[in-house]
Amino acid sequence: KKGEFIIWLSDIHFDNGKGKHAFPAQDNDQQKCLSSRVVELADKYSNGNKCAGLAISGDLTWQSQVEGFELASKFIKDVSSSLSLTPDDIIICPGNHDVGLVSKEQYFEIMGKPTTDTPWATLAENYHKGSKENYIKFYKDVFQRKPEEDLSQGRKFLLGGHKVVEVAALNSCVLQQVKDSFLGMGFIGEKQLSNVAESMGWMNKSGEYISKKRGVTRIAMLHHHLTSINEAEDAYLDSKYSVTLDAERLLRWVVKHKVDYILHGHMHRSSCITIKKILSPLEPVSASNPEHTFQIISLGSSGVASSELPNQDCANYACIMDFSGEKLAFKFFKLDRQNGANETATYAIEGLS
């Protein structure tokens, strides 16, 4: 690709018109839909430079409704058409809202009251299966092929004709997402990490690590957060809190494969943290016990209603990942249905050297 920037979005939350998506389904006299705002941002930022790709870190829908996935598919196709992107230029991972996160109240609102005495656990399990089927149908529509069994994905970009960027999209929603049972909790699993590393060419079939070539940027993208995002969580009796259950396993995987950046959404809050990690922290650094520095960056939400945004920063964001300089730059731009994109980023994060 001649282009040297990738647009990153997250937590768009398309719905059936009764959910929490903040933008109109199509442009009108007063407001612009999300695809128009994203294309407008890309055109303003490009300065003659082509957009090279689109990354979405989960929660494309509000409650995994068919209508939400249809709007998500239309959105991706509209943006792709306007920016001359192909399916090979797009990478996504599912969020917990895409694969069946639902409470009893939400279930009855969406599906209606059950006419039988079917246990709630069975209803929730069936809803989860149906949600996953909706996601797979959406994936096939966008990419013209079936997804991997674990819903992971990988892409390798050659930007500006010489910069190699490898992006591994992980499914952090392996566990069934049911209220009062793994509500919002992330889980990736050892098998998925091994499969992705091998598919990306980071590890051979014997489990031996393949050295990262000089100048290559490696990115892992998932939906759930790995470190604390909110300053404090409200305590509720018997409440399940949102965590990634195998976060340490993923962080060790990042060190082993020298991944430079982890991108995620989920909490609708933008943040950045730089971590220096050793595989065995109580032992000296060595070839078999390497030290690695990487950044974890959270985008927030690109399309959810203001009622679901943090009070401290009640805005929707898109991030431009700009690879044109010596260091990767993450530039966060506000998206607004009534006003066009600003020329200047609200936040700018300098990447690693």
Residue ranges and their predicted role:
Residues 15-17, 61-64, 94-107, 176-178, ...:
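Active-site environment of divalent metal-dependent phosphoester hydrolases
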Residues 43-50, 160-169, 178-281:
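His/acidic metal-ligating clusters that form di-metal
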Residues 8-10, 52-59, 85-96, 219-223, ...:
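Active-site neighborhood of phospho(di)ester-bond hydrolases with catalytic His/Asp-centered motifs
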Residues 1-7, 152-169, 216-217, 289-295:
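Beta-strand-turn-beta hairpins that frame and shape the catalytic cleft
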Residues 1-71, 75, 85-88, 101:
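N-terminal active-site segment of His-dependent metallophosphoesterases
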